[in-house]
Amino acid sequence: MTQSTTSHYYVESPSSRALVVGAIGVVFGDIGTSPLYSLKECFSPEHGIPFSPDAVLGIISMLFWAFVIVVSLKYVMFVMRADNNGEGGILALMALALRTAAPRSRMAKLIMMFGIFGACMFYGDAVITPAISVLSAVEGLEIAAPGLSHFVIPITLLILALLFFIQRSGTHVVGKLFGPIMVVWFLALGALGLIHLVQAPGIVKAINPVYAVSFLHDHSLQAFIVLGSVFLVLTGAEALYADMGHFGAKPIRTAWFVLVMPCLILNYFGQGAMLLGNPDAIENPFYLMVPSALQLPMVLLATAATVIASQAVISGAFSLTSQAIQLGFMPRMRIRYTSAAEIGQIYMPVINWILLVLVICVVLAFKKSDNLAAAYGIAVTTTMVITTFLAALVMRNVWKWNPALVTLISLTFLVVDMSFFAANLLKIAEGGWFPLLMGGSAFFLLMTWHSGRKLLRARSLEDGIPLEPFIAGLLAHPPHRVEGTAVFLTGNTESVPVSLLHNLKHNRVLHERVVFLQFVTRDIPYVDDDERLSCKDLGGGVYILKSEYGFKETPDVQRVLDLAQRKLGMQFELMETSFFIARESVIPSKLPGMSMWRESLFAWMHQNGAKPSDFFSIPANRVVELGTKVEI
């Protein structure tokens, strides 16, 4: 996606092969590192499943059919069809589903809350994924070099700290290696699995779903608990849809069916084959399937793969936060672009350091990947259930599919999703509470901000003066006009900006050209430059300039002025242009709205958000900020 008109990930259109390799490096890092801990966790003593060949076959069968139903059918075949101008992810899906509901209706509010809650659950995932991935990789030292086992946590913390510290410089240089490294990783997974599969080919019987059904029937409650661990193989599946805008659906589908899925299935079947012949290997089936001489190199390769998986999640957190800001669910924050070639490469200091602190706390609190596995999954299952609901709305109301077909497809996926969700709920006390707490806290903050902004707009409209009649009266009896251009940033072009009223009150002048600039976020990810600007001439050198942006773009005032010059013929000399911004101080009150403590929280968030001049990239020496107090 170029910064101007397209939604492609790279400025120059890369080849299909490059897109496939790039997708392997970014999209499949999380799901690709699950073999490090998933099968081991399925046989955790806490589940009470006695080890037996039938149990191995049953669990491997469940893993196989989880890949087929959830990833291959649900995400690859159905959900990835629901693109919003090429973009995927739960916020893009929410925007699509919202088009099917009447504005401000109860259904629209419900869709919005579901979508935002699903997105918020990603923040819990963004903390746990780096912790469990890197920790499980470094734990390979306990097998490869037992003498270094007491250094597992310090090494993990060092790697994670370095990963977060390099975010400010961007990862676009080393990022070119992500794809090739992950290709090597998946080939290694497949090769290791194939070696053991050849030695015990009987494990192939697990393809028969009868083994999964028999396991569930024979072990009832224990098998249901194991479902929560089986789900670990699917963590990261949602990335196939979320990263669709970066690489396109076809390269992601190709990577999944040609390399990723075959190699993952080979590895899990290989681990199962090894366990049939050596039950003691359940201590760490992944590393024990590696020949002794290659265990240390495999630890290094696994660590590289988990760092790549963690990087994808961190970048996802930055991207999600940026989208939430544009959609009006978060206060403005500093966003830095770390690559001139890829608009998706952004860095958000506040989010970066919060994640680092939380990841370190999680590693120190849980200490082992086994313990973290209990906390993993609940956030992803929640998002998957919500995705199924939203996709059903899109299938029925946007694509106009037959209601019976939509019901059949949705119920099939919902039964699977809810089974995994219910199984993960059993792990709340063991650590599942953490991602729920993270996601719930984020949801509360986002909804508080959204509600506070609505109150703020309502108060402004109540006290506002209609803009066009005011300008007509002002031009009929004009104050002293001074040279230059005044740009007034406003969120509502129906009312007179407070900054203009204060300027007239205190300075008693009006610039020879006045521009009211409004940024509007649309429900699509990107807006073409040809459709971005609209201008209304109010006469007397006064204009309303509206600039539309997608929810994955960041407004830039200088770029808008350049575009206005090219598209509309409006000349702007930056050093002769002053930008007037109203800096609102929010005062909590007993007026109808939110509770006082939530209003106080909103006021604090509003006060600590990034300055509009920083967020909109306005030169600091051209900004005039005028303060005003608003009671909500």
Curated annotation (Swiss-Prot):
The chain crosses the membrane at residues 19-39, 59-79, 110-130, 146-166, 178-198, 221-241, 256-276, 298-318, 346-366, 375-395, 403-423, 428-448. It holds the Pfam family K_trans. It catalyses: K(+)(in) + H(+)(in) = K(+)(out) + H(+)(out). The keyword Coiled coil does not apply. Belongs to the HAK/KUP transporter (TC 2.A.72) family. Transport of potassium into the cell. Likely operates as a K(+):H(+) symporter. This is Probable potassium transport system protein Kup. It comes from Cupriavidus metallidurans (strain ATCC 43123 / DSM 2839 / NBRC 102507 / CH34). The lineage of its organism: Bacteria, Pseudomonadati, Pseudomonadota, Betaproteobacteria, Burkholderiales.
